[in-house]
Amino acid sequence: MGFYNSGGYSGNSGYSNGFGSSFALIVVLFILLIIVGAAIFNY
């Protein structure tokens, strides 16, 4: 995934461990942004 390589969320030490958590974090933030954006545009 390009997001992880460019971001370098957990660095070299926790690469295998941090991949899943950082990816989940990005997905959750993205979903929250979409929900908030939809709420703002609707009102």
Swiss-Prot record:
Keywords: Membrane, Transmembrane, Transmembrane helix. It is a single-pass membrane protein. It is found in: Membrane. One of its GO terms (cellular component) is membrane. It comes from the Bacteria. The chain crosses the membrane at residues 21-41. Belongs to the SscA family. This is Uncharacterized membrane protein YuzJ. It comes from Bacillus subtilis (strain 168). The lineage of its organism: Bacteria, Bacillati, Bacillota, Bacilli, Bacillales.
